[in-house]
């Protein structure tokens, strides 16, 4: 019995030593630290967060493309046109307030040229802005949406049908069409500081068109040949 107890104590001692021994350096450093300060550790290499440029040449077909600087088509982007003096747009009769700074239009809406629209618009029909002009807010149209040449939209663009953006148009926010999206030369969507998404069933691009962000053609997208 005594021998069994002795061997048990010996086995327990050896096991305890083997378990504690790996922690001795840490315990010794804790009791009498030799490092006066924490050792510097080299930081991991920073990720490349800079803009990534990509160009789709005329004749290219695509579905989903991501890039901070996406050029669709070839040739130089035309210089931004100088907008004329704009007149403050007035909502038509029957328009209802929508949100904090918007209007709900229950029928088709045509916006004349040289207009400043300082609000968001919800149109239960077709919307057409003749351009040039500036719209400071989001736009949502049910049937179709057409921005004429030189129209600047500071907001997002939504349509349950087709969208046309004529030459020189710019949209600072995202663009979403449940139908087709037609982009004319000189169109700019998004900004380098604020990449956005462009989405439609079908995209018809006549470049050069510049998009900051991503484009998604659910069925097909194509860049027309020059």
Give each language-model segment a name.
Residues 1-29:
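N-terminal signal-anchor transmembrane alpha helix of single-pass membrane proteins
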Residues 23-226:
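Extended beta-solenoid/beta-helix repeat architectures
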């Amino acid at each position: 019995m005594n021998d069994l107890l002795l061997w048990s104590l010996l086995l327990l001692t050896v096991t305890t030593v083997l378990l504690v021994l790996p922690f001795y350096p840490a315990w010794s450093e804790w009791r009498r630290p030799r490092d006066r300060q924490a050792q510097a550790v080299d930081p991991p290499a920073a990720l490349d967060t800079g803009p990534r440029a990509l160009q789709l040449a005329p004749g290219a077909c695509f579905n989903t493309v991501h890039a901070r600087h996406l050029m669709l088509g070839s040739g130089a982007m035309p210089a931004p046109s100088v907008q004329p003096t704009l007149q403050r747009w007035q909502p038509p009769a029957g328009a209802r307030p929508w949100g904090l700074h918007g209007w709900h239009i229950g029928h088709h809406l045509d916006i004349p040229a040289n207009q400043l629209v300082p609000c968001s618009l919800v149109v239960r029909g077709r919307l057409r802005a003749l351009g040039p002009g500036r719209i400071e807010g989001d736009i949502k149209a049910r049937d179709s949406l057409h921005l004429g040449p030189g129209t600047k939209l500071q907001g997002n663009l939504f349509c349950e049908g087709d969208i046309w953006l004529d030459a020189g148009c710019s949209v600072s926010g995202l663009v979403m069409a449940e139908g087709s999206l037609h982009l004319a030369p000189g169109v700019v969507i998004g900004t380098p500081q604020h990449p956005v998404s462009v989405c439609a069933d079908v995209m018809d691009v006549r470049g050069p068109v510049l998009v900051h962000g991503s484009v998604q053609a659910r069925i097909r997208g194509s860049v027309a040949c020059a």
